[in-house]
């Protein structure tokens, strides 16, 4: 007696749902119900919450009447089979009140999409590592910058969830591929006002995640409808839905300013990073701050100043992504090294060998040893195996 769901997603980037007309859908044989932002709970949650005492903002509902991006969840149709659910979903008509929106860094920083009382910058963070120097006399300044676009995980298996509610036992069981059974239980119990002991989450075998299934989008929907209908409910996202309606790696704008001695030794570096969290903040504060801990693990940096900010545009939501900012940090740092090598007229590998961290060095942020990292050995071996010096000589 499984019920199948088809989602109703926002067709506008920013605004309010004023009315949902579901009469045609409900008249279709085999349709069990149309659940949406105007006839279900208005309790809020965070898709990033992993336990009840996490300091994260509860910004979203199971179905949102205040929509913040194209693809935001506004409702779901439950039916006897997937084909009927999809057919009924196409019959639902939604009225919106549209608001100004922003999809890029500049418009968002200017507050184009801000409501009265809101600020464009949602969070700022600063960190200093090492002893601040007197100045930059005798040092050569090198500036580099880059923008990194959103990136989707593209897991083999898209997002899927099955929820089953036993009204006699008041027991809700959720089956889904996920990275935190306790996080899902915490969120669902709070939303449906159930004791956590009455919510059971079964982690299914995952067809890939890479962070995509560390946050909760389908589970609240399936749980709510299963409890309403009192039968098993299945929700499967298409590839298009997974790419636009779950999480992506957030877009970043990163600037680095390094100061070097004439022989190429890095003495100071200043980072300025902007992370676009997309429509909801989620893990953005933690994610951009995690980046601050990465530079001193790869390079010997006597002094680092890190400044970051988080903005929220009307775009797909940023979330966990494999390596949690290490790839972004590597890109901006290696771009900085290439720019420095060009300005100082040095070989790119030679410059790196002069500055990379060595086994046993101290991570200046954590004050812990880096152990057996051997970056210098890897560079030297690569230089030899790829005949780097020969290639450079031929290029000249």
Which residue ranges define each predicted feature?
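C-terminal catalytic domains of large/alpha subunits in multi-subunit enzymes
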Residues: 37-38, 193-198, 228-233, 262-263, ...
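Extended active-site and interfacial segments that coordinate phosphate-rich ligands
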Residues: 5, 90-103, 179-181, 186, ...
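Helix-loop-helix junctions that connect adjacent transmembrane helices in secondary transporters/permeases
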Residues: 110-192, 356-396
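Glycine-rich loop/linker segments at domain edges
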Residues: 49-53, 57, 122-161, 167, ...
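General beta-strand structural signal in soluble alpha/beta enzymes
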Residues: 33-38, 69, 142-146, 174-176, ...
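Acidic, glycine-rich active-site loops and adjacent beta-strand->loop/helix elements
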Residues: 40-41, 178-181, 205-209, 237-247, ...
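Flexible, low-hydrophobicity surface segments
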Residues: 1-119, 228
């Amino acid at each position: 007696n499984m019920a199948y769901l088809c989602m109703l997603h926002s067709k506008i980037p920013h605004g309010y749902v004023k009315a949902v007309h579901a009469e045609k859908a409900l008249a279709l044989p085999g349709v069990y119900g149309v659940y949406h932002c105007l006839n279900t709970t208005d309790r809020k949650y965070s898709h990033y919450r992993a336990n009840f005492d996490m300091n994260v903002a509860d910004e979203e509902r199971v179905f949102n009447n205040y929509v913040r991006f194209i693809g935001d969840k506004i409702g779901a149709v439950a039916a006897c089979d997937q084909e009927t659910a999809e057919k009924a979903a196409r019959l639902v008509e939604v009225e919106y009140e549209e608001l100004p929106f922003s999809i890029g860094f500049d418009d968002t920083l200017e507050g184009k999409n801000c409501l009265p009382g809101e600020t464009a910058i949602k969070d700022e963070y600063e960190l200093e590592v090492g002893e601040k120097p007197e100045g930059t006399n005798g040092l050569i300044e090198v500036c580099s910058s880059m923008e990194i676009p959103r990136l989707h995980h593209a897991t083999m298996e898209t997002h899927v969830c099955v929820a089953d509610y036993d009204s006699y036992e008041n027991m809700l069981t959720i089956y889904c591929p996920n990275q935190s059974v306790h996080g899902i239980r915490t969120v669902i119990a709070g939303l449906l006002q159930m004791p956590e002991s009455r919510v059971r989450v079964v982690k299914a075998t995952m067809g890939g995640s890479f962070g995509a299934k560390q946050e909760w989008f389908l589970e609240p929907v399936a749980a709510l409808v299963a409890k309403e209908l009192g039968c098993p409910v299945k929700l499967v996202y298409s590839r298009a839905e997974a790419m636009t309606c779950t999480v992506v790696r957030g877009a970043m704008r990163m600037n680095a300013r390094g100061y070097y001695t004439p022989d190429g030794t890095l003495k100071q570096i200043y980072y300025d990073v902007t992370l676009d969290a997309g429509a909801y903040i989620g893990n953005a504060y933690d994610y951009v701050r995690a980046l601050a801990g990465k530079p001193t693990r790869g390079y010997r940096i006597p002094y680092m100043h890190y400044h970051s900010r988080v903005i929220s545009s009307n775009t797909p939501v940023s979330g966990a992504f494999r390596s949690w900012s290490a790839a972004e940090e590597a890109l901006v740092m290696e771009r900085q090294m290439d720019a420095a090598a060009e300005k100082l007229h040095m070989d790119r590998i030679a410059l790196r060998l002069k500055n990379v961290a060595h086994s046993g060095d101290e991570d200046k942020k954590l004050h812990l040893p880096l152990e057996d990292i051997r970056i210098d050995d890897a560079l030297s071996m690569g230089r030899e195996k790829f005949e780097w010096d020969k290639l450079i000589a031929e290029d000249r």
